[in-house]
């Protein structure tokens, strides 16, 4: 735990010098006890906050980029928006005056600085606001304030309610801190952006809160990161999927995009769309964009004769009505020794099924198991491969 005196020390010249010295320690699993003891001998009562800060900075680098001088708490770092996601949001708010009312240690402020016309940050936690001042600098106003008590006249308010309690995630938006419905009421007269967990029931959220703006689901490098509520004045659609990549380009889909797609049997490839597309309910729009079709109208798996660029697909080698015995026989016939199993719409645990299959061959394969109509079907596929490639049939290799 950090207090204000810790922040004052760590942000001072003496603290910076001590952090530079502490950063020479590895704090690996094998050296942690010895490093901590050495730090305690050298820095006494400051040893704990020095060790924590060095380790948090190392953990933060992959998520936030260059944070050599930043200060964090562990909880603040866990909830901090990844830099790529924050930059995407900032771009949508370019040229506006923005107030982040749950600014924490300043990850969103850093992305907004220089993009928005002006930026204000506030948080109820005095330690986090002190850290944000250190992290962002004096040119951005950061103050202590209750997120539910409007304290500026900024055009746009951003809120990122706490979604953890006692180390556990909260899935009910009314249990967030502050609750989502309270945030919506407090800023009903402003343009508002609210970050939420991507696993929310969006229909239920709209019904309970009356929210009528855009719900954007964002993924980064294949992992779904957040759902973001954009009030009507900022909305460009009802539903949006934003797929971001650390390297390369991403894409967006909305419910305004064409959604004409057929339901048909499997073609050469099966494609599992990005999680943001699935959570945003835009599978049909994705299929229409790439000339794909659905295997079942209720299931997110798509099929086609080619794989969209930058996406990994499963090349179909065989298909059969699902039964564990028949699947084991089909895999054995192809000398399968390792298998990736993905499942949709069928009550199966892939890890347990993989163990029960008892494969003894040498060829890596993939299996896609899905509900189609009233039954389940298994597709034996070549090992997953990226778009633009054609994987040879393992039996002919």
PLM regions with names:
Residues 1-397:
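SAM-dependent transferase fold signal centered on methyltransferase-like domains
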């Amino acid at each position: 735990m950090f207090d204000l005196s810790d922040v004052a020390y760590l942000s001072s010249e003496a603290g910076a010098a001590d952090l530079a010295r502490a950063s020479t320690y590895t704090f690996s699993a094998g050296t942690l006890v010895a490093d901590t003891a050495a730090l305690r001998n050298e820095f006494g009562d400051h040893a704990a906050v020095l060790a924590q800060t060095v380790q948090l900075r190392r953990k933060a680098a992959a998520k936030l980029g260059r944070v050599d001088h930043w200060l964090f708490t562990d909880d603040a770092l866990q909830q901090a928006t990844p830099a790529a996601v924050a930059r995407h949001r900032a771009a949508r708010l370019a040229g506006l005056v923005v107030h982040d009312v749950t600014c924490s240690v300043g990850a969103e402020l850093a992305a907004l600085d220089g993009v928005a016309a002006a930026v204000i940050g506030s948080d109820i936690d005095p330690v986090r606001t002190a850290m944000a001042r250190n992290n962002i600098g004096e040119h951005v106003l950061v103050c202590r304030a209750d997120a539910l008590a409007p304290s500026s006249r900024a055009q746009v308010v951003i809120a990122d309610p706490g979604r953890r309690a006692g180390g556990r995630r909260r899935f009910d938006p009314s249990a967030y801190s502050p609750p989502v419905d309270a945030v919506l009421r407090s800023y009903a007269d402003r343009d508002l952006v609210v970050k939420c967990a991507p696993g929310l029931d969006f229909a239920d959220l709209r019904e309970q809160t009356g929210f009528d703006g855009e719900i954007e689901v964002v993924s980064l490098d294949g992992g779904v990161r957040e759902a973001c509520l954009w009030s009507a004045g900022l909305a460009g659609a009802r539903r949006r999927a934003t797929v971001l990549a650390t390297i390369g380009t991403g894409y967006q889909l909305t419910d305004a995009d064409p959604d004409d797609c057929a339901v048909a049997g499997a073609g050469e490839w099966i494609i599992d769309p990005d999680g943001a597309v699935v959570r945003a309910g835009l599978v049909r729009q994705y299929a229409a964009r790439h000339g794909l079709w659905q295997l079942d109208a209720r299931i997110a798996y798509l099929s086609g004769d080619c794989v969209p660029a930058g996406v990994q697909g499963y090349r179909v080698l065989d298909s059969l009505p699902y039964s564990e015995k028949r699947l084991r026989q089909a895999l054995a016939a192809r000398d399968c020794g390792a298998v990736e199993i993905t499942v949709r719409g069928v009550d199966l645990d892939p890890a347990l099924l993989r163990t029960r299959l008892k494969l003894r061959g040498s060829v890596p394969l993939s299996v896609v198991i899905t509900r189609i109509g009233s039954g389940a079907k298994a597709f034996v596929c070549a090992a997953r491969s990226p778009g633009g490639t054609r994987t040879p049939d393992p039996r002919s290799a």
